[in-house]
Amino acid sequence: MLQVKIVPVTAFAQNCSLVWDSETKEAVLIDAGGDASVLKKEVEALGLKVKALWLTHGHLDHAGAVGELAKEWSVPVIGPHKEDQFWLDMIQEVSARYGFPIPQPVKVDQWLEGGEVLKLGEDEFEVRFAPGHTPGHVIFYNKNHGLLWTGDVLFKGSIGRTDFPRGNHEQLIESIKRECFSLPDDTQFISGHGPMSTIGYEKQFNPFVAGKAG
């Protein structure tokens, strides 16, 4: 059985997801953005064995703890798409600029493409390429449980910023329409910040994209 616990990290309250198989206790962390000690305590308290660190994109609040945890646990870093390499290359510089602790460098072991499938136990997670917030942003969809991890593409009542280097508003809107709004309305999603929502709710009420499903 798939289990999920959201652990907010960093001063930006980024929603890191601890996802695990309740039978095997094998786990992944999606967007381990910071506060490595907090994440380690959560993993230890639940008796989990982390198998990989997945990334939706390369921003510091999503990737800040990845270098440290990958090294400590000897696990691979999977994602995002290679177009976000420049963000990961700059993670120490950007962290210093924002007054964040300087993280360890992030080395990606497997870049992702849309259409690939990641596995955790018996569960499959479809990788969907959703650029716009960043050029290499990916999202993860678990059809079996109707769960989607949108990173900073789509939020409850909002969408991702596109005023960062290589952000693109039109591309973001297209990504939301193509990769999020094509999913069933009852799909629940976990975004990078804020509360969960459903695809159907955002189609109807999100002021930035409502009515743009087709």
Predicted regions and their residues:
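Active-site HxH/HxHxD metal-binding segment of metal-dependent hydrolases
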Residues: 35-119, 123, 204-211
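A generic local structural motif
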Residues: 14-17, 39-42, 63-65, 113-114, ...
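Conserved beta-strand hairpin/beta-sheet module of binuclear metal-dependent hydrolase folds
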Residues: 1-46, 139-151
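Residue-level recognition of specific faces of alpha-helices
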Residues: 3, 15-18, 35, 52, ...
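Short, glycine/acidic-enriched loop or turn micro-motifs at the edges of active sites
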Residues: 24, 34, 60, 84, ...
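Metallo-beta-lactamase
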Residues: 93-94, 117, 124-213
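Active-site neighborhood of phospho(di)ester-bond hydrolases with catalytic His/Asp-centered motifs
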Residues: 29-30, 51-58, 77-81, 129-132, ...
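Short Gly/Pro-enriched turn/cap motifs at secondary-structure boundaries
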Residues: 7-9, 107-109, 129-131
